[in-house]
């Protein structure tokens, strides 16, 4: 073998090693996700999302900017005033949640090199497109200039209330769950298109899908917030699959005490929602 051929083999070998090393690095890279929301983002990301990712070897840092019932309009006011109005909950790579009070949007946006940032409307207004139209563009503009260009913005499609909900905001939808769900799906789809947001996380559709199973309308703990196991797990599965593009069906993680049938409902409801984010998929899963 002449010297030139040996040289080429060495160079090719080094390139292969570099590519393999790059692949390992990419797998080990910590993905940073921030939700600018309220108690519905608390339900979706503060538990189970870290564990679902960890089960597939994905390292995460997950943040939630929390004010109970916070609307897009209020987020915009807080941005304008640079108000230290948020509880900032942060789940580190170790899975432990820590909280800092009196935090501003500006401070939290600068806290990490965020890969994904989600926005959402407060539940009473979540199916009213005009409320997105009034506040979302300004909030997007505020956020974008404070984030790296690589950061992907997302819109969180939240869920309709339980059919028996006593929440005052249910009157906006004639106290009808399907009316509320369809209004949310339509408003979020329209808002995402109008504001060029390419990633919609269809938690609302996933919850509605799960309601077609043997579980029925038992995904909430108080008529509007999610049940702490099956409800929150369904939402977390949806976030996981939409962000990481890994089919969540078969993910080994489930919260303690959740049986296999309910685990299957949550995972399949989420998977179907990511495939069809604006329509309900009937699930034929028996207990």
Feature locations, PLM:
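Conserved catalytic region of serine esterases and O-acyltransferases that act on ester linkages
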Residues: 29, 219, 223-287
């Amino acid at each position: 073998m002449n010297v030139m051929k040996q040289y080429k083999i060495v160079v090719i070998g080094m390139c292969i090693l570099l590519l393999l090393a790059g692949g390992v690095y990419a797998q080990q890279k910590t993905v940073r996700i921030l939700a600018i929301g309220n108690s519905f983002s608390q339900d979706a990301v503060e538990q189970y999302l870290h564990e679902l990712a960890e089960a597939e070897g994905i390292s995460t840092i997950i943040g939630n900017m929390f004010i109970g019932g916070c609307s897009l309009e209020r987020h915009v006011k807080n941005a304008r005033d640079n108000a230290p109005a948020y509880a900032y909950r942060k789940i580190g790579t170790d899975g432990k949640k820590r909280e800092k009070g009196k935090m501003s949007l500006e401070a939290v946006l600068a806290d990490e090199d965020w890969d994904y940032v989600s926005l959402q409307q407060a539940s009473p207004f979540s199916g009213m497109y005009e409320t997105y139209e009034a506040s979302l563009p300004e909030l997007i503009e505020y956020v974008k200039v404070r984030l790296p260009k690589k950061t992907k913005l997302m819109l969180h499609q939240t869920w309709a209330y339980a059919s028996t909900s006593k929440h005052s905001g249910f009157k906006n939808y004639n106290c009808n769950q399907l009316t509320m769900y369809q209004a949310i799906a339509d408003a979020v789809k329209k808002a995402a298109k109008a504001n060029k947001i390419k990633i919609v996380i269809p938690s609302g559709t996933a919850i509605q899908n799960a309601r077609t199973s043997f579980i029925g309308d038992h995904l909430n703990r108080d008529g509007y917030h999610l049940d702490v196991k099956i409800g929150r797990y369904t939402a977390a599965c949806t976030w996981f699959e939409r962000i990481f593009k890994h089919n969540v069906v078969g993910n080994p993680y489930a919260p303690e005490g959740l049986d296999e049938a309910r685990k299957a409902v949550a995972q399949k409801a989420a998977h179907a929602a990511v495939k069809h984010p604006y329509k309900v998929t009937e699930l034929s899963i028996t207990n």
